[in-house]
């Protein structure tokens, strides 16, 4: 089954609007296709702008006036019949579902995989209160596997033909998910292949 790694940058915490959607399709033959879209939005909460560095003016300029509905059919087709992979996927799913509903485009996730929940008991980062382990951040999972973040940066630039440069940019996070998933797959299967050889720091783990 083909996989689609994705991340969103949103206008707030509650399902309102998606300002950026980046995703990478990894086909059955390991072909890699990256897509990144910015969308014009009505409003960006101060908290969201502080985290991402992107406000309404940025989205208007970067999108060229394009809105989510303009690309909804293409996006829905790209997600169709694929394993969708994200970090804290329920958050992104809520935004995707509401944007597709607004656009009037039938949409659903066939199968999903949440890297945050999967790696929670692998990273074993102590939680607070009654929680044995905390939900790990994406960077914490990457660090636990000794993955080189500089190499992810360069890889994301190659895939999207752009400079991403931030953990709060959907392009970088999406490339991180792709690398993380494939590195762990090789580790789990006892394989030292392309992903471990390319992205894991030598002698670090």
Regions from the language model: what does each represent?
Residues 1-103, 109, 139-146:
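Conserved non-catalytic scaffold segment of RNase H-like nuclease domains
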Residues 3, 121-122, 157:
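General secondary-structure edge motif
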Residues 13-15, 120, 179:
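Conserved protein kinase catalytic core
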Residues 61, 112, 154-155:
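Proline- and acidic/polar-enriched loop/turn elements at helix boundaries
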Residues 80-90, 95, 99-100, 128-205:
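Acidic, Mg2+-coordinating catalytic module of metal-dependent nucleases/exonucleases
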Residues 113-133:
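Short alpha-helix plus adjacent loop in nuclease-associated cores
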């Amino acid at each position: 089954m083909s996989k689609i790694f994705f991340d969103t940058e949103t206008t707030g915490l509650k399902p309102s609007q998606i300002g950026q959607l980046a995703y990478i399709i990894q086909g059955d033959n390991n072909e890699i296709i990256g897509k990144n879209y910015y969308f014009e939005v009505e409003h960006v909460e101060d908290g969201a702008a502080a985290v991402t560095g992107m406000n309404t003016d940025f989205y208007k300029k970067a999108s060229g006036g394009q809105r989510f509905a303009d690309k909804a059919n293409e996006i829905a087709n790209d997600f169709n019949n694929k394993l969708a992979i994200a970090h804290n996927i329920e958050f992104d799913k809520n935004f995707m579902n509401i944007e597709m509903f607004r656009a009037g485009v039938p949409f659903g996730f066939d199968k999903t995989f949440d890297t945050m929940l999967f790696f929670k008991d692998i990273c074993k980062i102590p939680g607070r209160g009654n929680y044995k382990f905390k939900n790990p951040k994406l960077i914490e999972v990457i660090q636990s596997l000794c993955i080189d973040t500089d190499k992810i940066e360069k890889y994301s630039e190659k895939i999207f033909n752009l400079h991403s440069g931030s953990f709060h940019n959907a392009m970088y996070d999406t490339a991180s998910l792709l690398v993380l998933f494939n590195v762990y797959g090789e580790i789990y299967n006892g394989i030292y292949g392309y992903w471990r050889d390319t992205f894991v720091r030598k002698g670090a783990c």
